[in-house]
Amino acid sequence: MNLSSGKNEKNTTLTAENQTIIFRLTALWALNDCGLGGFLHALNVPFSGLIIGGIAVALISFIAHFSNVNKGVILNSLIIVLIIKLLMSPHSSVTAYFAVSFQALCALVFYRILNINLISILFVCILSFLESASQKLITLTVVGGMSFWNAIDVFVENISKQLFADGITHASLWLVGTYFFIYFVFSVLLAFFIYSLLEQFKKMNISKRDNPSLWQFENVTVAKPKKHLPKWIKILLYSGIVVFVICTFFIYNKEQFYNSFLIYYFARTVSVILFWYYIVMPYAMAFVKKFLNNKIPAYQSEVDEIIELFPKLRLIVYYAWNQTASYKGLRRLKHFFTITLFEIISFK
């Protein structure tokens, strides 16, 4: 259960209590990345994608805090999370591994340079969420091409002209701007929340706290998680993009709709999808799997311990969700994560 024993950087100054806390935080990070998303969907939690990313950044920040921003500890925790993700979510895309790694490396860089304070937490949260937002938009643009955004402009402009005197122009820019703004606002709120929670932990003596026993969580009802969307759903979504673009230009901009455009756009989109799913993704995932499989022997005991801990963590997560039933919206999410963190760190 010693996460500071990897090859990256050793730190013998970590207390046994801090090593236990870091181990449990790493376990919760792995659960969050591998299975908590499905459980939040099952609980009908809104904006679960943003919440999963927010929880990950918060947990990385707490691991950095309890390890005194030790590079070896943070990187070891990251590798363990990636290995568990490979074992338990083998169909995850390579972009998911990149996002997790980016969050951890971003935290490592800024916390080591600026220490852990409100400014560095803001940098980590904002960059992590902007990377996540950019990743989705880049994928959409690669698959749909600029014609997709042009189709949105044409579609919204023509619809808005039927409702208002002046049509709405450059709708795609407004859409992308709003999308980034939502991610930015959420990241700023998250940064202030992480900072305030860290300040609470600094004032709290965990060793003298009344630690709960797991029997308190045994009667908690655990909902069945929803499965990840199969690949054919994504392909169907991309097909919908093609149909949307073609229909929009055909209905509202016939002078630009001609046979060569139809053939070109259809061939381009199909080629991109085939290239992405059958060449880029398999080779990228092969590299990721080879790297992580080489790491498994060195981390096998920690990985096994964390996977065995998952059922207990799930009980605590549902206990925390039930305990916050009287709260609504972001207030409930705030108390939910706070209770989850306190209970997981301190249970016997």
Predicted regions and their residues:
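Hydrophobic transmembrane alpha-helices
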Residues: N2-L86, P90-S92
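Alpha-helical transmembrane segments and their membrane-interface exit regions
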Residues: I55-F62, I83-L86, S101-R112, S128-E131, ...
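Membrane-embedded alpha-helical hairpins and interfacial helices in multi-pass inner-membrane proteins
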Residues: I121-Q200, A223-S239, V243-F266
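Charged, low-complexity cytosol-facing tails and large interhelical loops of integral membrane proteins
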Residues: L3, A56, I307-K348
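Membrane topogenic helices and adjacent juxtamembrane segments
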Residues: M1-G37, A165-H170, Y195-I206, V220-A223, ...
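Juxtamembrane inter-helical linkers in multi-pass membrane proteins
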Residues: K203-K224, N294-F310
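Short helix-perturbing small/polar motifs within transmembrane alpha-helices
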Residues: N2-S4, N11-Q19, R24-W29, F98-L140, ...
